[in-house]
């Protein structure tokens, strides 16, 4: 398994609309906004070179992002790495003893399959893997 690029950096926000002005001031523009019911969030992607910033707004108080915001406030939520074969990545990481939040890929933004490594395995960083089979 090889993570071949940083796909995006997820930023938890209370409101995407309230967060956009600072990113627009940096020259970034929102490309796509969508609801991701499996994660209970609305996402907005702002391309930045070969990567993107993903703004994450909770859809409900019981979403993982809402809990993150209540505990830590707005800020960097996760780093996402692109992988070609997410099933192989899950087997490889689990076989090496890393703790996965979801051992089965779930639907993420843009319909991509995603898994998350627990922050305990990522030295305090929530790591997302997203399958990009292209």
Regions found by a protein language model. Name each.
Residues 5-7, 26, 30-41, 59-77, ...:
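A cross-kingdom feature marking solvent-exposed beta-strand/loop segments within repeated
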Residues 6-13, 23, 46, 53-56, ...:
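Short, structured motif recognition centered on aromatic/hydrophobic residues
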Residues 14-28:
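An N-terminal domain-start capping segment
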Residues 19-22, 89-93:
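Hydrophobic side chains in well-ordered alpha-helices
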Residues 44-49, 53-54, 81, 90-134:
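Vicinal oxygen chelate
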Residues 72-73, 86-91:
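Long, charged/polar, surface-exposed segments that mediate recognition or autoinhibition
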